[in-house]
Swiss-Prot record:
It is found in: Cytoplasm. It is an enzyme of class 1 (oxidoreductase). This is Glyceraldehyde-3-phosphate dehydrogenase. The lineage of its organism: Bacteria, Pseudomonadati, Chlamydiota, Chlamydiia, Chlamydiales. NAD(+) binds at residues 10-11, 33, 77, 119, 314. One of its GO terms (cellular component) is cytoplasm. Catalyzes the oxidative phosphorylation of glyceraldehyde 3-phosphate (G3P) to 1,3-bisphosphoglycerate (BPG) using the cofactor NAD. The first reaction step involves the formation of a hemiacetal intermediate between G3P and a cysteine residue, and this hemiacetal intermediate is then oxidized to a thioester, with concomitant reduction of NAD to NADH. The reduced NADH is then exchanged with the second NAD, and the thioester is attacked by a nucleophilic inorganic phosphate to produce BPG. Keywords: Cytoplasm, Glycolysis, NAD, Nucleotide-binding, Oxidoreductase. Belongs to the glyceraldehyde-3-phosphate dehydrogenase family. CDD domains: GAPDH_I_C, GAPDH_I_N.
Length: 334
């Protein structure tokens, strides 16, 4: 599979890192970003959160060079001018965060790409896939797909375990979310909402999120049953989902733990992880699981009403699932 990465920010860089780390058969042929290639090479090599990577990487003749591997840098703002046909691109990993509307993303197809994977919640009629939850519903005819958000990738596997074992009447989710590149280091104006412009490392900032509602895109039985909000907090990486849920059938917290533990060792293996350790957020920096269920943190009010907690590295965990989905698409498009 020949892919290009459109947008070499946090997620774009970590997708490339994970492809190289696992020696994936995926071939990255180009990166399109308006930032200078030598600076992007530097940012790829040195990461303040996840440490240095590919120390032998250099910038030469407009390429990111790693031994025998060369990835061409492009800096084209107009999607319709990108040379995807000439490069024989199978999939565009759309990770700018700017193109999430189906009509906008379709311009990659007009430029010659065979498929587009949006690394964000999509707008419009775009199939959404979460590994371990509904990825097997992928149809090769789907030429524009979404991997949802990092938070949906954490919440949806947990919701599926609950749905399959106990049923879900309704639920509210809060994600206590690490700071992201859209936030300001110091107070300033925000286009999205006033509070979002306040200093990221001085404040706990309430924010909106569609992550809980998006679970209904991959688990239709839960459409209209989940919603939620976010608190942006002053940490660089790792977030946590707090799910307050009313189940359809009576059970115990211990039974929920057993159901999650079983799923983590079987159907959700490599997607979910179960822990009874006294963990904190920094313990999960670099964690490749989508959802780490914290058995010590949850509580029960009665036999149908529970608060459940799951951790996730909102960067590495999500980037890993993108690579998983790419490889799944490759295997199931032949």
């Amino acid at each position: 599979m020949r892919i290009v990465i459109n947008g070499f920010g946090r997620i774009g860089r970590l997708v490339l890192r994970q492809i190289l780390k696992r020696n994936s058969p995926i071939e990255v042929v180009a990166i399109n970003d308006l930032v200078a290639g030598d600076l992007l090479t530097y940012l790829f090599k040195y990461d303040s959160t996840h440490g240095s990577f590919a120390p032998q990487a250099t910038f030469s003749d407009g390429c990111l060079v790693m031994g025998e591997r060369k990835v061409h840098f492009l800096a084209e703002k107009d999607v319709q001018k990108l040379p995807w046909k000439d490069l024989d691109v199978d999939v565009v990993v759309e990770s700018t965060g700017l193109f999430v509307n189906r009509d906008d993303v379709a311009k990659h197809l007009d430029s010659g790409a065979k498929r587009v994977l949006i690394t964000a919640p999509a707008k419009g009629d775009v199939p959404t896939f979460v590994m371990g939850v509904n990825h097997q519903q992928f149809d090769p005819a789907d030429v524009i797909i979404s991997n949802a958000s990092c938070t949906t990738n954490c919440l949806a596997p947990l919701a599926k375990v609950l749905l399959d074992n106990f049923g879900i009447e309704e639920g509210l989710m809060t994600t206590v979310h690490a700071a992201t590149a859209t936030q300001s280091v110091v107070d300033g104006p925000s286009r999205k909402d006033w509070r979002g412009g306040r200093g990221a490392f001085q404040n706990i900032i309430p924010a909106s999120t569609g992550a809980a509602k998006a679970v209904g895109l991959c688990l239709p039985e839960l459409k209209g049953k989940l919603t939620g909000m976010a608190f942006r907090v002053p940490v660089a990486d790792v977030s946590v989902v707090d799910l307050t849920v009313k189940l359809s059938s009576a059970t115990t917290y211990e039974a929920i733990c057993e159901a999650v533990k079983h799923a983590a060792n079987t159907s959700m293996k490599n997607i979910m992880y179960y822990t009874e350790e006294a963990v904190v957020s920094s313990d999960f920096i670099g964690c490749e699981y989508s959802s780490v269920f914290d058995a010590q943190a949850g509580v029960a009010l009665n036999d149908r009403f529970f608060k459940l907690v799951a951790w996730y590295d909102n960067e590495i965990g999500y980037a890993t699932r993108i690579v998983d989905l790419l490889e799944y698409v490759q295997e199931n498009s032949k």
